[in-house]
Amino acid sequence: MAIIHRATITPTMGELLDAWLDSQPWCPDGAVEMLGSYRFDDPAGQVGVEGLVARRSGRLLHVPLTYRDAPLEGGESFLISTMQHSALGERWVYDATGDPVGVRCFVRALRGEQEQAGMELWDGDTLVGRREPTARVYAEPSSPGIAPSAGVAVVAADGIELRLTRVIGTQLNGERQLVAEWADGRGVVAALA
């Protein structure tokens, strides 16, 4: 179960995302519209793993993130930003393609070994409710695709190849694919080759 705290976050997720997306060659300029998000549970309960679905200048984007309470050793090139979280303190936000915990969550989901997490909303030490995710993800057999392009991050892990889309709509090939559905859309966000 993913725990969501009622908190003030600085910089805001929108500010953090804008700054990082501005530096990405696969992302156009413009305002970011958040369409949905989903989470996975880290089995060790230490790292937050979240996938964001957004639109910027008409392009659908998939942004997989991890949240840590300390820097990821060797992960400097994947650090997106740090942020102050009023309930949890300083957090390090990473591109999940460079975080072993995030990569393993996606691999398990693609293999059918891990479902997306439910979300509990906490105010301090009090559980105040549950929140439905704004995007649903599920694994299914893959349909034929084409080779990865600039809109795809390719990660080699444990003898397999994980492909995470950056730009939703980019075709992927692989044995299994992870599909995200949100209020007005659907797209493949990952594949296992």
Language model: regions and residue ranges:
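Internal, well-folded beta-alpha domain core
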Residues: 66-193
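Generic detector of ordered, mature protein regions
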Residues: 22, 30, 48-53, 73-78, ...
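Short beta-strand segments
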Residues: 5, 59-63
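Contiguous mid-protein beta-loop-alpha structural module that forms a pocket-lining wall or clamp
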Residues: 48, 57, 65-71
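N-terminal domain-onset segments
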Residues: 1-40, 77-79, 94, 102-103, ...
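Short, structured protein-protein interaction patches enriched in aromatics and acidic/basic residues
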Residues: 27-60, 126-134
